[in-house]
Amino acid sequence: GIADCAGAPVVAVTADAYDQARAAAAKVVVEYEELTPVLDIEDALEREQYTYPPQIMTYGDPDASIAAAPRRIKGELRCGGQDHFYLESNIALAVPRDDGDLDIYSSTQHPSEVQHGVAHTLGVPSNAVTVEVRRMGGGFGGKESQPTIIAAIAALMADITGRPAKLRLRRDDDMIVTGKRHDFLFRYEAGFDETGRIAGVDILMGMRSGNVADLSPGVLARALCHADNCYYLPNARLSGYPCKTNTVSNTAFRGFGGPQGMIVIE
């Protein structure tokens, strides 16, 4: 297999106590063949490396309207990422039942996705997996899709050992291996008149999707659809590129692409 980002799961270790498991995991030696990574948005754009096809919205004639405008502006803008920093890190408990089914206790915003992911991992029907969310110590989008792999690993260990298994990420590990708010690179050009009325815009949005798509399609679509904000754009080309990089996949975050789309027009 290929570990295509820092924090990619390679091996799971079980023990009777949390500290024992961490100590054992620290003794694992993995030999890697180094590949050339793509770490930033510019490299991914240059290589045309995306997690799914680009999204391009065009209406009117942006090229002609910008060229004919008495005034023009052109530039580049960056919008950084952000960690959710929920108080409770990702955690899951998997408990085998006497009838062969499995109970999962997960800190998740999306129990049905956890159910589907665990069932797929174990090769069992979804009705063999029951997911319960007793409480959740914060989420903000960070526990919409990300808890699935945590629960799947715990479930796999429980299935192998026949005993309850819990996987709890330390804060530093959680920040390394889970996705964040998508960071963006914007390249824009706009034409307007002396009163500030916009004639046309051409906006490129390069979004760091990470190593897999995750929820990037919806985030990028919302960023594109929020790019006009409160302004009337008679002619526009809005191009969104979900850049595939060797970094952990970014994910849902409050606003879900809307804030990134709005900041570029401002």
PLM regions and their residue ranges:
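Structural alpha/beta core scaffold segments of enzyme domains
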Residues: G1-E266
